[in-house]
């Protein structure tokens, strides 16, 4: 664990979580602090919405407020963003790209070691394909297609076609703020999105369970 006290006078600290025992790491890091702000670098740890809420609970318990989360893990970025936190995805060359809900910027794609990062809405007729995981900051409109060898993660609405685990990986998953696809595929399984609207404030996740694709909220508690 590394702790970098950026401004102790104003109780602004930055910490890095390095192990699966991140909750205890965080408790030890903020011990002795009362009120202030904290920036968390969770590295490659895969944090769910439930995990992020636990981080917030621990910090709030001593009056600390999380101002941002940095990570190399796309799932953690989607989880933090879904809960309204500032999130920064670490790409190649130690560059952090801020995750925002404003998609008016020009589209751009960047390839990380195990991730294709795309910023911008995919429109009808457009195809985004990669052998690794794909993270999209924007909507996938009807008529657009996403094909990934790994997971598909969308900070936006999935209204087109998405295929995760295209080489047969049935452990792959598809996550979005709203899953209403024309077609959903994981490995060799096919499904359509539900008609019901998602619960407010919750991302949705599609996985294979008992040989069928199941869509459920990414629970925050």
Swiss-Prot record:
One of its GO terms (biological process) is division septum assembly. SUPFAM superfamilies: Cell-division inhibitor MinC, C-terminal domain (SSF63848). InterPro entries: CAP/MinC_C, MinC, MinC_C_sf, Septum_form_inhib_MinC_C. It comes from the Bacteria. Keywords: Cell cycle, Cell division, Septation. Belongs to the MinC family. Cell division inhibitor that blocks the formation of polar Z ring septums. Rapidly oscillates between the poles of the cell to destabilize FtsZ filaments that have formed before they mature into polar Z rings. Prevents FtsZ polymerization. Interacts with MinD and FtsZ. This is Probable septum site-determining protein MinC. It comes from Prochlorococcus marinus (strain SARG / CCMP1375 / SS120).
């Amino acid at each position: 664990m590394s702790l970098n006290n950026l401004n102790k006078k104003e109780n602004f600290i930055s910490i890095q979580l390095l192990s699966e025992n991140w909750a205890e790491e965080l408790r030890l890091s903020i011990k002795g602090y009362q009120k202030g702000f904290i920036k968390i670098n969770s590295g490659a740890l895969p944090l769910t919405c439930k995990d992020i809420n636990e981080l917030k609970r621990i910090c709030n318990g001593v009056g600390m407020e999380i101002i941002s989360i940095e990570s190399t893990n796309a799932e953690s970025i989607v989880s933090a963003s879904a809960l309204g936190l500032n999130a920064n995805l670490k790409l190649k060359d130690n560059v952090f790209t801020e995750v925002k809900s404003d998609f008016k910027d020009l589209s751009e794609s960047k390839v990380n070691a195990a991730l294709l990062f795309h910023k911008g809405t995919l429109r009808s007729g457009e195809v985004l394909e990669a052998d690794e995981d794909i993270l999209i900051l924007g909507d996938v409109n009807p008529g657009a297609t996403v094909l990934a060898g790994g997971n598909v993660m969308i900070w936006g609405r999935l209204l087109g076609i998405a295929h995760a685990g295209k080489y047969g990986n049935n452990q792959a998953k598809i996550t979005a703020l709203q899953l209403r696809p024309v077609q959903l595929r994981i490995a060799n399984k096919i499904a359509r999105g539900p008609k019901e609207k998602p619960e407010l404030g919750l991302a949705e996740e599609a996985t294979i369970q008992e040989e069928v694709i199941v869509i459920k909220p990414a629970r925050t508690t």
